[in-house]
UniProtKB/Swiss-Prot annotation:
<feature type="binding site">
    <location>
        <position position="81"/>
    </location>
    <ligand>
        <name>substrate</name>
    </ligand>
</feature>
<dbReference type="GO" id="GO:0046081">
    <property type="term" value="P:dUTP catabolic process"/>
</dbReference>
<comment type="pathway">
    <text>Pyrimidine metabolism; dUMP biosynthesis; dUMP from dCTP (dUTP route): step 2/2.</text>
</comment>
<dbReference type="Pfam" id="PF00692">
    <property type="entry name" value="dUTPase"/>
</dbReference>
<dbReference type="GO" id="GO:0004170">
    <property type="term" value="F:dUTP diphosphatase activity"/>
</dbReference>
<feature type="binding site">
    <location>
        <begin position="68"/>
        <end position="70"/>
    </location>
    <ligand>
        <name>substrate</name>
    </ligand>
</feature>
<dbReference type="InterPro" id="IPR008181">
    <property type="entry name" value="dUTPase"/>
</dbReference>
<dbReference type="InterPro" id="IPR033704">
    <property type="entry name" value="dUTPase_trimeric"/>
</dbReference>
<keyword id="KW-0479">Metal-binding</keyword>
<dbReference type="GO" id="GO:0000287">
    <property type="term" value="F:magnesium ion binding"/>
</dbReference>
<feature type="binding site">
    <location>
        <position position="95"/>
    </location>
    <ligand>
        <name>substrate</name>
    </ligand>
</feature>
<feature type="binding site">
    <location>
        <begin position="85"/>
        <end position="87"/>
    </location>
    <ligand>
        <name>substrate</name>
    </ligand>
</feature>
<keyword id="KW-0378">Hydrolase</keyword>
<comment type="function">
    <text>This enzyme is involved in nucleotide metabolism: it produces dUMP, the immediate precursor of thymidine nucleotides and it decreases the intracellular concentration of dUTP so that uracil cannot be incorporated into DNA.</text>
</comment>
<keyword id="KW-0460">Magnesium</keyword>
<dbReference type="GO" id="GO:0006226">
    <property type="term" value="P:dUMP biosynthetic process"/>
</dbReference>
<comment type="similarity">
    <text>Belongs to the dUTPase family.</text>
</comment>
Length: 148
């Protein structure tokens, strides 16, 4: 496993908890809500939740913002644009777009763990335009074509 150094800036609304891995083999780090007051996410609605941090990722890395499984299974709270992407050249506050798919309103309290962040390396592509693609067994089959 490779460990990279990522610069992190604590913003004015920072609550004192840097993102951290919960276990030795956790892929994601928990992000906490840095809201001044409680935020209610009504059923079917979306709220943008601040985290109080900004980061400077190295070139060729991104941060992916993903749901916390416990919030999703217990309350129907998930990340609306999952996975949210934080690009290497973004320097603003990381915010999490949460949606309530549950059956009752949900309150986000200050300091609550709201999402997880995964740092991932990515590759850029150079398109090679062609009129013919190589054949595969699957072909054009999609959306359930391989079975349930």
């Amino acid at each position: 496993m490779t460990i990279i150094e990522v610069k992190i800036k604590k913003l004015e609304n920072f609550l004192g908890n840097l993102p951290e891995y919960a276990t030795e083999h956790s892929a994601g780090m928990d992000l906490v809500a840095a809201n001044e007051q409680s935020i209610t996410i009504k059923v079917g609605s979306i709220q943008l939740i601040p985290t109080g941090i900004a980061i400077a990722l190295p070139e060729s890395f991104e941060a992916q913002i993903r749901p916390r499984s416990g919030l999703a299974v217990k309350h129907g709270i998930t990340v609306a644009n999952s996975p949210g992407t934080i690009d290497a050249d973004y320097r603003g506050e990381i915010k999490v777009l949460l949606i309530n798919l549950g059956n009752k309103d949900f309150i986000i309290e200050k300091g609550m763990r709201i999402a997880q962040m995964i740092i991932a390396k990515y590759e850029r592509v150079l398109w090679a335009e062609t009129s013919i693609l190589t054949e595969t067994m699957r072909g054009r089959g999609g959306f359930g074509s391989t079975g349930l």
